[in-house]
Amino acid sequence: MKELKPAILMLIIFTILCGGIYPAVVTGIAQAVFPKQAKGSLITDARGREVGSTLIGQPFSGPKYFWPRPSATPEFGYNPAGSGGSNAGPANPAYLKTVGERIKALRDAGIKGSIPADLVQASASGLDPHISPEAAKVQIPRVARARGMSAGALSRLIAAHTEDRQLGFLGEPRINVLALNLALDTLMP
């Protein structure tokens, strides 16, 4: 019993410290220093309603919108609870079939020429909110037709929403699809 008392006391102390005090302090610091990020990097529409996060991809399938990367999450697309890649290699027959079906769907939607890989391959998490500028540009004719807009106006919108490499050398230029589509709705509903 003598050895049990200090063990129980330490359990209680560390439970309070690690389960209560530490998370409260870290959350407080995050709220003070990075308030937007601490709340999930939420995006609001023109009416101020929260419509998504800059960190998680959203499904868009209509011809009036730019389409995101395919989702790799099971059951239904863009499910954060099921985040994770398929782990299928580039020679996997099921993977090749899926990519082939995606290419056919893009061709059927009117995309001509070279198709950027990020329009047919899911990201490692399956929830990537970004596409490359090239992936947005190949969609311009479809979106322009569906919205009755000029290709030039869409090109300018894409350029305005292209994020550069982080610190000038990390990653590739990218476009957040949700932010681009919200701007598109604001410009021409």
UniProtKB/Swiss-Prot annotation:
Provide one Gene Ontology biological process annotation: potassium ion transmembrane transport
Q: Does the keyword ATP-binding apply?
A: yes
Q: Name one GO molecular function term.
A: ATP binding
Q: Does the keyword rRNA-binding apply?
A: no
Intracellular or extracellular location(s): Cell inner membrane
CC annotations in GO: plasma membrane
Keywords assigned: ATP-binding, Cell inner membrane, Cell membrane, Ion transport, Membrane, Nucleotide-binding, Potassium, Potassium transport, Transmembrane, Transmembrane helix, Transport
Source domain of life: Bacteria
InterPro entries, per the entry:
KdpC
* Principal cellular location given in the protein's record: membrane
The residues that cross the membrane are 6-26
Give the membrane topology: Single-pass membrane protein
What do we know about how this protein assembles, alone or with others?
The system is composed of three essential subunits: KdpA, KdpB and KdpC.
| Role summary | Part of the high-affinity ATP-driven potassium transport (or Kdp) system, which catalyzes the hydrolysis of ATP coupled with the electrogenic transport of potassium into the cytoplasm. This subunit acts as a catalytic chaperone that increases the ATP-binding affinity of the ATP-hydrolyzing subunit KdpB by the formation of a transient KdpB/KdpC/ATP ternary complex.
Write out the similarity annotation: Belongs to the KdpC family.
| Name of the protein described by the UniProt record | Potassium-transporting ATPase KdpC subunit
What taxonomic ancestry is recorded?
Bacteria, Pseudomonadati, Thermodesulfobacteriota, Desulfuromonadia, Geobacterales
